[in-house]
A protein has these predicted regions:
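Domain-level signal for soluble alpha/beta catalytic cores
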Residues: 1-204
Length: 204
């Protein structure tokens, strides 16, 4: 049986300073996020994904604008964390970030574009503090800079094993971010299918 395929509309980071909610700058950014969300939803996506969020100041107007346009569609939020599992940009602990996102309407919280070590640190903390599904999508490794740009050294088997560990830790959705090729994606899919088959067999 084929897996259901869902398409999320990605809304990336904006790299702003903090603005008060009643400022013209905040309202402008919120309006831009609203327009982007409208465009993605009109194109037929199944939900909105605000990803690679490094700080709450970046999330605030983006999440508000996305919620303005969502009209019942899910809005997922995904943070970038350091190897301790806290936000890379402002150092806020991941539990507080989860609380803020959920309080302001996020239907799922997670991490992406981080190291495996960062994901390993963040996932159990997020699962323990979140009331919504937790997602995890780290990079496949550390890039090596060459004259032709960054080169990523994949270890599909190790990444697939990590996916199983995140699922066992309580993550609802697992995947990958930068450096991913079809090889790693296939290894993930195979490992997760085996994990699901074993779970179904053990708990009919």
């Amino acid at each position: 049986q084929a897996h259901p395929q869902l398409l999320l509309g990605s809304m990336g980071p904006i790299g702003i300073e903090w603005f008060a909610e009643d400022s013209a700058e905040y309202r402008e950014i919120r309006g831009i996020a609203r327009e982007q969300a409208h465009a993605l939803l009109n194109a037929g996506v199944d939900g909105l994904l605000i990803e690679t969020v490094t700080s709450i100041r970046n999330l605030q107007p983006m999440l508000a604008g996305a919620r303005d346009a969502a009209d019942g569609m899910p809005v997922l939020v995904s943070f970038v964390v350091d190897d301790k599992g806290d936000l890379l940009g402002d150092g806020l602990n991941i539990e507080a970030a989860v609380l803020y996102a959920e309080k302001h309407g996020a239907n799922s919280v997670g991490v992406n574009c981080c190291s495996l070590a960062a994901a390993n640190a963040a996932v159990p903390r997020m699962v323990a503090s979140a009331t919504t599904p937790v997602t995890v999508r780290p990079n496949v490794g550390d890039p090596v800079q060459t004259q032709d740009g960054p080169v990523w050294h994949e270890n599909p088997e190790a990444f697939a094993r990590a996916c199983i560990e995140w699922r066992h830790a309580g993550a609802a959705m697992v995947g990958s971010c930068c450096g991913t090729s079809a090889i790693t994606t296939a290894a993930m899919a195979e490992a997760l299918d085996r994990c699901l088959a074993c779970a179904v067999y053990a708990h009919p």
